[in-house]
Amino acid sequence: MKLGDRIFALSHLWVQFPEYRKFILEQKEKHGAFITLDNSAAERALVTEDVLIDVCKELMPDEVIAPDVLFDKNETIANAVKFKIRMDNEKLSDKINIFFCPQGKTKQDWLLAYEWGLDQDWIKVIGFSKIAVPNAWLDTFEDDQKIMEARHECYDYLKERNLLQKPIHCLGQGDPTEFSYYDHPMMRSTDSVFPVLAASHDQLFENDHETRIPTPHNYLETYDMSQVDMSKVEANVTFLRNQCNIAWLNVNSSTIPF
């Protein structure tokens, strides 16, 4: 099932599930879908560079998120450089854009990683992680809480300093009304499984868009969607879409059983 405008493919699911690979390939080959390949760091899947390169060769996505390490600026930058060299050696750099997700334990570290990403001409897209941004920008961090507040603070800071210079993709979401705030043309796109997760708990955004049920890290592999009212999923996606000034919306509905 596909409810978004393009496909956000998770590399660990590509490796694990043949039916997932079939669905993603059909969206690419039959429908010409724009595909972002995620490295699955947020899912703690520990996908290696070798695996990510192999998936790139099989899928040939439009863009791939370079391997990042949660909250670690130095390792994330080092991984991105190493990944770029590997992409060059595999002759993939001229076919697949590289997407960089800044990391850092502090706001200062995160900003250093972000500005480093701006300075690399081979980095085409930058991600605002639902995990990394709240961790760096808020005084206290709680999993999947205050995502909107943290990203608004980050956005305001960057906008005021003319640092929104490359397309931004918001990785995941909290309160879906977050996206109505963005008016800068570099705010490109978002993805989230939350409209599906919320519907599975009978949460309709039109009634309650503030409560954020934390997403289990293995949610996409293990949750049984057979009893979920898909009209509620569609209503939540519509609510989210109506908040978006950004160009593209991804809903990880491709992970619902086919």
List where the protein language model places each region.
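Non-catalytic, usually N-terminal nucleic-acid engagement modules in DNA/RNA processing proteins
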Residues: 1-92, 253-258
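Alpha/beta catalytic cores of nucleotide-metabolism and tRNA/nucleoside-modifying enzymes
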Residues: 53, 119, 152-169, 175-258
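Eukaryote-skewed repeat-based solenoidal scaffolds used as protein-protein interaction platforms
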Residues: 56-190, 195
